[in-house]
């Protein structure tokens, strides 16, 4: 059993501090573990190769800027001609191509380092675009702009304007992807060259297409007005060149459960739960029930709760009935409590005496003070020679002492003995 803290503010604080410091070091000094990082998707190899080439080109600019720029022009030109295509410059550039934590870049650089050296010393003149030569032609990780897939096929809409300029060709520039066009809002078709559902052609020429939104519920239209509708969206019907809402609740389209009712909404419908009082319903509330649930009864046009407590439904001794919505429950009557399935009378705790909350030490101090006062009073009365008042006082003290000892006899006697 854990030790109880001492009484008093200062002793309690010292006790808590000693308990805290008694804990083993790893328990209260060890920091909480860091959260597990979420898994990171690996980039496409083409994207890694493009980043490598971009950093390579930045390195070329950096090495020229750091080594030359300002001074003797003739001397710089002579030195630059030697440094420009030197192995020293290549090493300096390659050292800064990949960041320390970019493992994909380091792996790709290790695989392609000989190709980069070959391009640096022998192929720069015939293939000045390192990205095209390395990533597309040599490693075959990428495709030219506007193409996709293992064979670098043209994206829908052509390589000049993939997806008509109104969408994104999936896998463009890589050896992967499907080439499917993900069109912008309002555009559709295989190459995003048409207006999508709910839009109409506001402007079109050989290189330009503007799609604007139709009136709310229109699926196809010739203009922005309500009367321009040609076809309506699902949940609407064309009536006199206008789209009107279909009330699905009056058709077989609505499929609600047995204890639900249908509510029509714009272009659709909702199924909502019947009231608790209903066993099937035609709408909200206890007045729209088809039948009443158990615990309810028909009163006029509504299903209302039955008060089961009007009849004797709680046979147990000292039980009483409490009505609930659609039912009832049996609980113990006031002054009783549940115990092992039956209601038993609650025991009222006896009121504590005057000395009930006092500790042993406090009793000893009080006892010593009490008897000290008695001895002092007796000595004073005896010194005055007043035998009558002395006798009365001794009798009163004896009566009080007898009552006190009857309440706390064991503890007082023990304290008295210890006090002596």
Curated annotation (Swiss-Prot):
Annotated membrane-spanning segments are 363-383, 385-405
Tissue expression per record: Expressed in myoblast C2C12 cells (at protein level).
For the motif CXXC, what are the positions? 46-49, 278-281
Renumbered to this chain, the signal peptide range is 1-29
Q: Where are the FU repeats?
A: 208-255, 268-315
Gene3D superfamilies given in the database record: Laminin, Plasmodium vivax P25 domain
Tell me its EC number(s), please: 5.3.4.1
Instruction: Tell me what topology the record assigns in the membrane.
Output: Multi-pass membrane protein
Cellular component annotations (GO), alphabetically ordered: glutamatergic synapse; membrane; synapse
Q: Which reaction does it catalyse?
A: Catalyzes the rearrangement of -S-S- bonds in proteins
Query: What broad class describes the main subcellular location of this protein?
Result: membrane
The residues covered by the EGF-like domain are 153-193, 305-342
Segments in the Cytoplasmic topological domain: 384
Question: Which stretches are Extracellular in the membrane topology?
Answer: 30-362, 406-420
Instruction: Relate the protein's function as given in its record.
Output: Protein disulfide isomerase. Promotes the localization of acetylcholine receptors (AChRs) to the plasma membrane.
Its recorded name reads Protein disulfide isomerase Creld1
Give the organism's phylogenetic lineage. Answer: Eukaryota, Metazoa, Chordata, Craniata, Vertebrata
